[in-house]
């Protein structure tokens, strides 16, 4: 294991313990604060095709964001991945009822069954906004994911499909997920902003 991978592994273990101590009530309180900042933002209001992660424990909850986006008539895409694959697709949520009935699959993450054949984003065009999760975030726009590399590869794949279209990349964080620094490798992709209760960190105003 390389030095960077080892440090990231230790960071994930530390954050897992830390985030496990946060109550559901506190997570919900911070989620509501982040939700208000998101729906009031210009980039959310103007977005037409956005990707939103489907939340689990220990992170900002996204059900209300997805519901709001659908109510506003936006095209909402969520992650879909399969066991043994390193690739992650973003597939369109048909409607609120379909989202509410998502089964819990790998790692307890809700996603559609492959046989449902939800439409992939690249069949109809680029995304203009991606709301990404993470284990930890730095004050400089770096994120530490869960170690599978799904989002970094997805960012790269989106660029290959649509090199002229760069979606806004936003990280959503609990306050406890903001740390001083994160070791990086050449495949790590920087975010444009990190949104959390009490503050917004902007790294790229393009």
UniProtKB/Swiss-Prot annotation:
Substrate binds at residues 54, 59, 146-150. It catalyses: (6S)-5-formyl-5,6,7,8-tetrahydrofolate + ATP = (6R)-5,10-methenyltetrahydrofolate + ADP + phosphate. Its cofactor is Mg(2+). Its EC number is 6.3.3.2. GO terms for biological process: folic acid-containing compound biosynthetic process; tetrahydrofolate interconversion. InterPro entries: FTHF_cligase, FTHF_cligase-like_sf, NagB/RpiA_transferase-like. One of its GO terms (molecular function) is ATP binding. It is found in: Cytoplasm. ATP binds at residues 8-12, 143-151. Mg(2+) binds at residues 152, 188. It is an enzyme of class 6 (ligase). It comes from the Eukaryota. GO terms for cellular component: cytoplasm; mitochondrion. It holds the Pfam family 5-FTHF_cyc-lig. Keywords: ATP-binding, Cytoplasm, Ligase, Magnesium, Metal-binding, Nucleotide-binding. PANTHER family: 5-FORMYLTETRAHYDROFOLATE CYCLO-LIGASE, ATPASE INHIBITOR/5-FORMYLTETRAHYDROFOLATE CYCLO-LIGASE. NCBIfam families: MTHFS_bact. Contributes to tetrahydrofolate metabolism. Helps regulate carbon flow through the folate-dependent one-carbon metabolic network that supplies carbon for the biosynthesis of purines, thymidine and amino acids. Catalyzes the irreversible conversion of 5-formyltetrahydrofolate (5-CHO-H(4)PteGlu) to yield 5,10-methenyltetrahydrofolate. Belongs to the 5-formyltetrahydrofolate cyclo-ligase family. Monomer. This is Probable 5-formyltetrahydrofolate cyclo-ligase. It comes from Caenorhabditis elegans.
